Amino acid sequence: MTPTSLARARPTSSHRWVPAAAGWIVGVIATLSLLASVSPLVRSLIRVPREWVDDYIFNFPDTSFAWAFVLALLAAALAARKRIAWWILVGYMIAAAGWNIAGLAEGRERWFAEVGEVIGLAFHLAAIAFLLLARKEFWARVRRGALLKAAATLVASMAVGTLIGWGLLELFPGSLARSDRFLYALNRVSAFAGADAASFSGHPHVFVNALLGLFGAVALMVTAIVLFQSQRADNALTGEDESAIRGLLELYGKNDSLGYFATRRDKAVVFAPSGRAAITYRVEVGVCLASGDPVGDPRSWPQAIDAWLKLCQAYGWAPGVMGASAAGAQAFREAGLNALQLGDEAILHPEDFRLSGPDMRAVRQAVTRARRAGATVRIRRHRELPADEMAAVIERADAWRDTDDERGFSMALGRLGDPADGDCLLVEAVQADQVVAMLSLVPWGGNGVSLDLMRRSPQSPNGTIELMVSELCMQSEDIGITRISLNFAMFRSAFEQGAQLGAGPVARLWRWLLVFFSRWWQLETLYRSNMKYQPEWVPRYACYDDARLVPRVGVASVIAEGFLVLPFSRRHEQPHTGHHIAAPGTLVATGLLHSDGTAPDGMGLQADLADDDQPRLPEQVRVRMAKLKALQAQGVDAYPVANPPSHTVAQALAAEDGADVAVAGRVLRSRDYGGVLFAQLRDWSGETQLVLDNSLLADGSTADFTRTIDLGDLIEVTGTMGRSRSGKWSLLVSGWRLIGKCLRPLPDKWKGLTDQEARVRARYVDLAVNTDARELIRARSAVLHAIRETLVAKDFLEVETPILQQIHGGANARPFLTHINAYDLDLYLRIAPELYLKRLCVGGVERVFELGRAFRNEGVDFSHNPEFTLLEAYQAHADYHVWIDGCRELIQNAAQAANGAQVFMRPRADGVLEPVDISGPWTVKTVHGAVSEALGEQIGPDTDLATLRLLCDRAGIPYLTHWDAGAVVLELYEHLVEDQTREPTFYKDFPTSVSPLTRPHRSIPGVAERWDLVAWGVELGTAYSELTDPVEQRRRLQEQSLLAAGGDPEAMELDEDFLQAMEYAMPPTGGLGMGVDRVVMLITGRSIRETLPFPLAKPR
C-alpha cells in the first residue's frame, strides 16, 4: 500500500456496512414512491404493503414526487457517508418511534394496529441503535453554501406551488370538500403528503394529485440547484488562489499544455502544504473531478495528490481525474488510483509543419480556397487589443456560439477580455475588412499555446479554420511559438482502429457507436478537425479509484466537459466568487499574491519557493549558500569583474625574494594557527603556499579570511615572495579578494575523485584537484599541436569539410542520423571526411589534411568513443609506402611533444606506467603473411574460400556464410593478428573486397595497396594508395550501395556527387587516416575516456 493510500485508509469497523445499507433501504423507498406517483398499476400492486409501511415504519404516500425527490437526495447522502444525512435519519427515526409510543400509550381498539405499532417501534429502536453504533462511519462533511438563500428559495417555491395547487383544486376539486382544498394543497406540495388522505373529506382527481406532488418536487429541485450552485461558487477560486496558480504556471507551466485551464474560475483548488503544487477540481454527481495534471513542481505532485485525496475522503466524494498526461497519470497511479487512456492530444510543431506533401493535400486545398476568397489572417496578443475591439470579439464569440459550423473543444477557459489573460493569443480571419472567424489560444509555458476557443461566421469561406491554423504555424517564429496544442480528441484510437482495413467486429461496432453519438456530441468532429494537420498524438488519461465508480466518473466527466448540460447550470464564472482562500497561509503571508487573480511577483515567488528547496540540498551546500547571502548583504560581490593578475603561480615561484606579485587561483587547503594562516593556492601553472599574518595584512585579519573563504573558492591575492618561518618558499599576503564563491565542497584533498564515472561526469572538479587530469589535457593539446606542426612543415593545407552530410560514406561504419528542419531533410553526422577531401584533391589541392571530429554509432569501450578526433591527410603523387614513414613520424613527434621522448606509456603488471621506446623504423608485414604465421599454415591471396573456412573452424573463429574470401581473411587477421600485436607494426596488402576505396595492388592480384598500423592490440591508422579510376570506383560503390539497400547499416551509400567529381580525374594519391584519440591513449598510457575532456556518459 502506498503512503498516500495509507493516509486515506480508515480503521476497519464492523459497522462499515450501515451507510450503504441505509442508503439502499431509503433508495428503494424513493424508487417505489416515484414509480407509484407515475404508474397507477404500481400504485395498485403495492397498496397494501405501502399503507402498512406508511402507518408504522416510514412515511410512504401513495403519490408524491416531492417526497421521492427528498428520499433520493437522502439515500445518496447516506451512501456517501454524509454526517448531515445521519442526523436527519436519526432524527426522523426518533420522531417515528415517538409517534408509535404515543399510539401505544393511547391504546387501540384493534389488536393488529397495536401489533403494527410494536413492530414499527422495534424497527425504529433497532435502526436508531445501528445508526448510533455506526456514527463514526458517517464522517463526510458538506461544503459551505448559502443556506439562508436556499431556505428562502424553498419557502418561496413551496408557497408558489401551494397557491397554484390550491387554484387547481378549486378548478378541478373532484370530491374534495371546499374547506379542505387549501390544506390538501399544502399537505401535498409542502408537507410531502405527511397527513393521510383519510384525514380529508373526499379526494381530487389522480392527475391533479400527481401535479401537486410535482410542484413540491420542482420546488425542492430549484432549492437544491441554488444550494449546489452556491456551494460551488462559494468554494471556487479566490483571487489569491488564481494568483498562486499563475505563479506556479510561470515557473512550471511548460510541463503541461492544459495547465492554463486551471485558472478557470468555476473550479475549486487544493494545494500541497508547501504551496509548490496544486490540483484544481470540480464536484459533479458526488465525484471530485480533477482537471488534468497537478499544477506546479512535479516533485510536489505527491503531496498535492495526497491533500486532494484527503479532501475527497473528508467530503465523501469519489476521486476522478480527467485529461491527465502520462506523467500525471503515473503520479495518480502511485497514489493508488487506476488509469485508463481517454484520448489523444494533438500537438503541432511549427518547425515541422509543411503544407506540401500528399498527407496535407486536404489542408492545402482548403487554405487555397480561403485565400482565393480574399481571406487574410492577423495574429495579436489579447493585451494588444483596445477595449472596443475586445468587446467586439466577445460579441462575435457569443453570436457565433450556436451555429452549426461551430468547432468548439472540450477543454476551454470560458472567458474573454479579462486583463489577467493578456498573454493569450487571438488569431482572426479577415475578409473584406470583416472578421469572419477567430481562434483564441492560451499560453503553454513561454513558447507554446493551447487552443481555447474556435468560432467562425456562417458566412466565412470554406477553409478559413485551416488557413488560420496554417498561418499560425507559419508565423510562429515571429511570435516565439514552438508548440501548439489543439487539445485532445476523445477515443481517437477507436476512430482510427475501427476505420482500418481488417478491423475486427468489436472495433467496428465501437467506432459505429462513437460516430452515432457524434450527432449530439463533438467526438468525431474533434478527431477529424485535428487529424488533418498530421499532428503528434500524445495520450491523455482518465483516472479513477475503483472500477465500480467508472460509470459515475464517466457521467461527471460528461457533465464537466459540457456534453451534458444540467438545467440552470452556470458555467465559466467571470468574477471570483470564492470566499475561502485555499492557498497555504505561508504563501499568502508573503504578500506576493494578488486579490485580482493576476500573476504574483515572479522573481519573489521563485525566491520564496527556492527557500523551500534549501532543505533538499546537502548541509555543506546550504551552509555555503547562507555564507554567500551574508556576503551579498554586506555588499561583497562574490563574482566580480576581472582584474588580471600580474603573475601566474609558476612565475611567482620563479620571482626574486621580496618581489611584489598578484596571483589568482583556487584555495585547496587551509591551516589556521590563530594569528597566522597557511593556505594552498593553485592555478593552471602550479601551486604555492600562501602565508596570511595579521601583522602583514594591510586590511582585515586572518579571521576575516576564515569567515569568508571556503575550500574551493577562487581568490586573488597580492603580496611579496619570501619564506615562511619554516623556510618554505611562499607568498606573503598583504591583501586578498574573493573572485568566485564555490558553493559545493571539493572532494577529499588527498584522494580526489576516486570513482572513474564521477571523474567523467565532473571533469571540472577532477581538473581542479587532480594534477594528473591536468597533465592529460596538456598532453592531448601537445599531440594535436605536434601533428599540425609536422604536416604544415611539409606544406600541407589544413581545411574543414562538412560534418552534416546527406550521404554517409568514406568508411564502413554505422552513422548517426539527424534532421534539418529548414529543408525537411535527413542528414548524417560524418563518419569520415574522406569523400570531401578527395574532391579537393580533384580540384588541385595536392597536400591537404583535416583534423576534426567524426561520429560512428558503434560500441563504447576503452578504445572506442562514438565521437572522436580523426586525422585524414592526402598527398598527390604518393602511395601508401610514402605514408609508412609519414605516419611514423607524426606519432613519434607527438610522443616527443607530450612525453619529452619518443615513448609510449604502458602499464606494468602492478599497474604502474613505464615508458616503451618507439623510436626508429617500425616492423612492416603483409596481412596474409601475418595470418600465416599465426595459423602455422601458409595462405595467400589465391587461397580458396573453402580452405579459409576450414582454417577458421580449426582456430575456433566464427564467420558468416555469405562472406567472401577477403572478409574471412579479415576476420582471421582481426582475431589472430591485430589483437595479439604489441610493438607498432604496419600490416599491408589487404584483400581488395574489404577495401572499396583502395586501388588494386600494382603487381599482386586480389589485394589492395592498403596498410593498417596496430600497436598493443589497437588500430591507430590506415593508409591507401587511393583508387582514382572513376569507373572502378563507381562499380565498387554500387556494390556497397546494394549491401546498404539489403540492410547492412555499415555499408556506404552511393554518392553521385563524389563519383561525378572523380570523373574529372584525381592524380595518383596516397591517403592517411589516423585515430588521434587512440594515439593519445597509447602515448599517455590511459584509456580513451580518461584522455577526452568530456567523453560521452550514460544518463544517470
UniProtKB/Swiss-Prot annotation:
The gene is lysX. This is Lysylphosphatidylglycerol biosynthesis bifunctional protein LysX. One of its GO terms (molecular function) is phosphatidylglycerol lysyltransferase activity. GO terms for cellular component: cytosol; plasma membrane. It is a multi-pass membrane protein. Mg(2+) 2 binds at E1019. InterPro entries: Aa-tRNA-synt_II, aa-tRNA-synth_II, aa-tRNA-synth_II/BPL/LPL, LPG_synthase_C, Lys-tRNA-ligase_II, Lys-tRNA-ligase_II_N, Lys-tRNA-synth_II_C, NA-bd_OB-fold. It is found in: Cell membrane. It catalyses: tRNA(Lys) + L-lysine + ATP = L-lysyl-tRNA(Lys) + AMP + diphosphate; L-lysyl-tRNA(Lys) + a 1,2-diacyl-sn-glycero-3-phospho-(1'-sn-glycerol) = a 1,2-diacyl-sn-glycero-3-phospho-1'-(3'-O-L-lysyl)-sn-glycerol + tRNA(Lys). Residues 602-1100 are annotated as: Lysine--tRNA ligase. In the N-terminal section; belongs to the LPG synthetase family. Binds 3 Mg(2+) ions per subunit. GO terms for biological process: lipid metabolic process; lysyl-tRNA aminoacylation; response to antibiotic. The keyword Methyltransferase does not apply. Residues 1-601 are annotated as: Phosphatidylglycerol lysyltransferase. The keyword Metal-binding applies. Its cofactor is Mg(2+). Its EC number is 6.1.1.6, 2.3.2.3. SUPFAM superfamilies: Class II aaRS and biotin synthetases, Nucleic acid-binding proteins. Keywords: Aminoacyl-tRNA synthetase, Antibiotic resistance, ATP-binding, Cell membrane, DNA-binding, Ligase, Lipid metabolism, Magnesium, Membrane, Metal-binding, Multifunctional enzyme, Nucleotide-binding, Transferase, Transmembrane, Transmembrane helix.
